[in-house]
From Swiss-Prot:
GO molecular function terms noted in the UniProt entry: ATP binding; ATP hydrolysis activity; ATP-dependent protein folding chaperone; unfolded protein binding
InterPro entries per the UniProt record, alphabetical: ATPase_NBD, Heat_shock_70_CS, HscA_NBD, HSP70_C_sf, HSP70_peptide-bd_sf, Hsp_70_fam, ISC_FeS_clus_asmbl_HscA
Protein name: Chaperone protein HscA homolog
One of the Pfam families matching this protein, by short name: HSP70
Species annotation: Pseudoalteromonas atlantica (strain T6c / ATCC BAA-1087)
Signal peptide: none
Gene3D superfamilies recorded: 1.20.1270.10, 3.30.420.40, Actin, Chain A, domain 4, Substrate Binding Domain Of DNAk, Chain A, domain 1
């Protein structure tokens, strides 16, 4: 008798069957695909067990070629062989030509905002070219795993803007992939090393690939990675190391002037071999034939190689220093340094990075594969392959989160449909002179005014140093973890005083309530925007009135005549009346009139302040 299979209601007969998901590193120079098998993340190779797929696509009259063969075609047919297409995603034709003026490609001029490349017998755009690379990786994965994929996590540089991210997503969908998520490359590298569950703190990701260098400074807090700063050089990478060795070889051989394409390619190949061999050897010798088939032999030592690349390496460290400065951090505040990209295998690079940050970089995972491996771990989580106890619930925010600003306005910090976990920060300032506290009112919703949104929490930041209005810098950070728990922290930057609160944004809301809130925001969009513009002008009128009245009280009697004071007071009375009415144009005119009436007063105050500051000082002491 056949046995019946019994399943939980709503589930398949095999509810715990693993789903196949992959992580894809769509790189500028090389691309990879990885998956999690038997609990271990691994990259997948082709039929020749080659894991790195050169990100090169060649178009002929008969076919489209991707990978190693296309890379070989690059020197033979450069106009029809697209290299480093990732640089073109989401960019206009003007952007591309400004950044890369010497490209050998024939671009169609008809639509500069959506660049098209004329290749053999057809026109293609960067999304289509990228999709060829992604299709090759998808087919490799399906052949290796024996089934269709449930989805993929595709990585992008942390600095990619919305257009570049959308281009990447479109390319993946065109390649037949269900995109589970776009993941920042430095975050993927950190996940590969398990840093997402490690001690909280600052992580630097140093990514030196074949053609580009990127440095990313991340902060890990409550399981969420926040990108604090990014930097780098889109025209510096391991290829430049190869060119420095070629230059050295040419000097050894006394070769000046142009080289034949064949000899140039041979020298580049030998330079790459020498670079890689010097990671394990003190000296390397290469043999090759010149154009006259004369056999030549050249040697290069590790010491010489290090001298050749010293300036290039220093350039990457300068970018690291700038990124730390942008993040307002010191080197000793960095907890871990993750190395990404094949060029970080060079011992000299690792030594210099270690010396710069004052700690040994993480290098145990193949730097070529670390991003794809991290992406595959994330993909495995997103398709639900983790046991219940380890299940990470990842979703999107159903409604925007923000806070109240002056005038009862809502400033959105994290917009709806943002994937969680997520962290975002914005800076705010004080409205009044000498203000020492700020009430933080956290709101949820899509409307422009506080009264039309849902109040989540209120807390007060005390201890703000007394300053002039607008001088204090309060950084408010919103963090939503994988369980949808919101943590809001406010910190005054000069003193370091801070306060925070936690709240569950979705608590008490069902789908129908969320839907109603979204409908209301769409139905009232025009009216809400007009109300916001009016409130903003009213707040500005109140700010100008308060600042000008305070200045008059402080210095008016000393610096102005009675007539001048009367003129300013009259403009303030007009401003006060206008600010209480609903005519936006009248408020704007009243603000402009008050500014004009107080112009001479502002100049006198400035002169008075300078004289006061210089009193009792000699030129030499200043």
């Amino acid at each position: 008798m056949a046995l019946l299979q019994i399943a939980e209601p709503g589930l398949s007969a095999a509810p715990h069957q693993r789903k196949l998901a992959v992580g894809i590193d769509l790189g500028t120079t090389n691309s990879l695909v990885a998956t999690v098998r038997s609990g271990q993340a691994e990259t997948l190779g082709d039929n020749n067990n080659q894991h790195l797929l050169p990100s090169v696509v060649s178009y002929t009259a008969e076919q489209v070629v991707v990978g190693e063969q296309a890379k070989h075609d690059a020197s033979l047919d450069p106009a029809n062989t697209i290299v480093s297409v990732k640089r073109f995603l989401g960019r206009s034709l003007n952007d591309i030509r400004r950044s890369y003026p010497d490209l050998p490609y024939d671009f169609d001029e008809s639509n500069p905002n959506s660049p098209l490349l004329n290749v053999t017998g057809r026109q293609v755009n960067p999304v289509e070219v990228s999709s060829e690379i992604l299709t090759t990786l998808r087919l490799r994965a399906e052949q290796s795993l024996g089934e269709e994929l449930s989805g993929a996590v595709v990585t992008v540089p942390a600095y990619f803007d919305d257009a570049q991210r959308q281009g990447t997503k479109d390319a993946a969908q065109l390649a037949g992939l269900k995109v589970l998520r776009l993941l920042n490359e430095p975050t993927a590298a950190a996940i590969a090393y398990g840093l997402d569950t490690a001690q909280e703190g600052v992580i630097a990701v140093y990514d030196l690939g074949g053609g580009t260098f990127d440095i990313s400074i991340l902060r890990l807090s409550k399981g969420v990675f926040e990108v604090l700063a990014t930097g780098g050089d889109s025209a510096l990478g391991g290829d430049d190391f190869d060119h420095m060795i070629v230059k050295h070889f040419r000097q050894q051989l006394g070769l000046e002037g142009a080289l034949s394409k064949r000899l140039h390619r041979v020298l580049l190949d030998k330079a790459k071999f020498a670079k890689e061999s010097l990671s394990d050897n003190d000296t390397v010798t290469v043999d090759f034939a010149d154009d006259e088939q004369k056999l030549l032999s050249l040697s290069i030592s590790r010491e010489t190689f290090q001298g050749l690349i010293a300036d290039l390496t220093k350039s990457t460290l300068r970018a690291c220093r700038r990124a730390l400065k942008d993040a307002e951090l010191e080197k000793d505040e960095v907890l871990e340094v993750v190395m990404v990209g094949g060029s970080t295998r060079v011992p000299y690079v690792r030594e210099q990075v270690g010396e710069f940050f004052g700690r040994t970089p993480l290098t145990s995972i193949d730097p070529d594969k670390v991003v794809a491996i991290g992406a595959s771990i994330q993909a495995d989580i997103l398709v639900g392959n983790k046991p219940d106890g380890e299940m990470l619930l990842l979703d999107v925010l159903p409604l925007s989160l923000g806070l109240e600003t002056m005038g009862g306005l809502v400033e959105k910090v994290i917009h709806r449909n943002t994937t969680i976990p997520v962290a975002k920060a914005q800076e705010f300032t004080t409205f009044k002179d000498g203000q020492t506290a700020m009430m933080i009112h956290v709101l949820q919703g899509e409307r422009e005014l506080v009264d039309d949104c849902r109040s989540l929490a209120k807390f007060t930041l005390h201890g703000i140093p007394p300053m002039a209005a607008g001088a204090a810098h309060i950084r408010v950070t919103f963090q939503v973890d994988a369980d949808g728990l919101l943590n809001v922290m406010a910190m005054e930057k000069s003193s370091g005083v801070q306060a925070e609160i936690q709240v569950k944004p979705s608590y008490g809301l069902d789908e129908s309530q969320i839907s109603d809130m979204l409908k209301a925001s769409m139905q009232n969009a025009t009216g809400d925007m007009q109300a916001r513009m009016l409130k903003e002008q009213q707040v500005e009128a109140a700010r100008v009135h308060e600042a000008l009245q305070a200045a008059l009280n402080a210095d008016g009697a000393e610096l102005l005549s009675a007539a001048e004071i009367g003129t300013i007071q009259a403009s303030l009375e007009v401003l006060d009346i206008a600010g209480k009415n609903d005519d936006i144009d009248a408020i704007k005119q009243a603000i402009s009139a008050a500014d004009a009436a107080s112009q001479i007063f502002a100049e006198k105050r400035m002169d008075h302040s300078i004289k006061k500051a210089l009193a009792g000082h000699t030129v030499d002491s200043i």
